[in-house]
């Protein structure tokens, strides 16, 4: 009778990525959250500029909102176990 257990993948194969033995292959999600907040800050800081039209402002606000949405989705998804 065949087993119904699925095969579990431990992550990264050491043959493919030698640095996994040193623990460098895991993505640090907190670092990416900080980078996302920094990117939002940079986008909103560019609102203060020497441009006359407001089309650029709407693009900057839109991209900052998009980054914020992705950041919050990732943060909440990890807390609730939806994303590993």
Curated annotation (Swiss-Prot):
One Gene Ontology CC term in the entry: plasma membrane
InterPro entries assigned: DUF2631 (IPR024341)
Family to which this protein belongs: To M.tuberculosis Rv2876.
Keywords assigned by UniProt, alphabetized: Cell membrane, Membrane, Transmembrane, Transmembrane helix
Lineage of the organism: Bacteria, Bacillati, Actinomycetota, Actinomycetes, Mycobacteriales
Transmembrane parts of this sequence: 27-47, 52-72
Main localization, broad class: membrane
Nucleus in keyword set: no
Pfam families on file: DUF2631 (PF10939)
Record's subcellular location: Cell membrane
Name by which UniProt lists this protein: Uncharacterized protein ML1584
Membrane topology: Multi-pass membrane protein
């Amino acid at each position: 009778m065949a087993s119904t257990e699925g095969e579990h993948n431990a992550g990264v194969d050491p043959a493919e990525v030698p640095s996994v033995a040193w623990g460098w292959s895991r993505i640090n999600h907190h670092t990416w959250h900080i980078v996302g907040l920094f990117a939002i800050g940079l986008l909103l800081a560019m609102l203060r500029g020497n441009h006359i039209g407001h089309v650029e402002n709407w693009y900057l606000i839109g991209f900052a909102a998009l980054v914020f949405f992705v950041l919050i989705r990732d943060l909440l998804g990890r807390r609730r176990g939806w994303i590993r």
